[in-house]
Amino acid sequence: MYNDAAIAIRWLLAHGAQRVVYLDLDAHHGDGVEKIFWDDPNVLTISVHESGLYLFPGTGYAHEIGGQGAEGTAVNVALPRGVTDEEWLQVVHAIVPPLLKKFRPDFIISQHGADPHRSDPLADLELTIDAMAQAYRSVEVWAQQFAAGRWVALGGGGYRVDAVARAWTQVLAASANVELASSSRMPDGWEGSPTLGDEGACAGIANFDPTKVMAERPHAALVQTTRAIFPYWGLPAYG
């Protein structure tokens, strides 16, 4: 089995890229890419995932920060079960852009599994397509800001077919800078598949402001990760 993201990163480094960011927003820890580049200070891996206490592969805790000489380049945010749209978006926006600004990547490679969705049968996060789409659009903006628009977006896991279809459609829409409603009609040929039903945003998402990341009561996972990682980059930790 081949790791498509790792192969792409290796190719980029071999063809002139100096620094590459791998951003994994799947429900599972991005352990494969992290392990391959554990000792490489030129690759920054960021994984926002459900805690290994509850979900395979059982790794990806805040204290896992990279090998000798590459400390601070493995970033892990281990979330508890039941994390909501707003909590997840707050964590993503608090962690990712400050590190991108410091690391100054030549390329961003991101992995967008659909299993953080609340209907997924394996994971226990409580995200809607609306929140996931907001994150995808944010990655597109960050790629423009910090990587001269050089962004490779990959699909990933997901175990409910309509959630996968809607999530990946939103990834494509974000990469094309197109706004697409999460309630857009599925193709007629798919009508026999289970459907998500009402995809209304959870409370707070409609008014979510990424510039106002919670500071007074930051999420515990955010505190743990920033305390472990941010000092390596001269950034103030939360909490």
Where in this protein do the model-derived segments appear?
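A general "terminal functional-core" signal
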Residues: 1-239
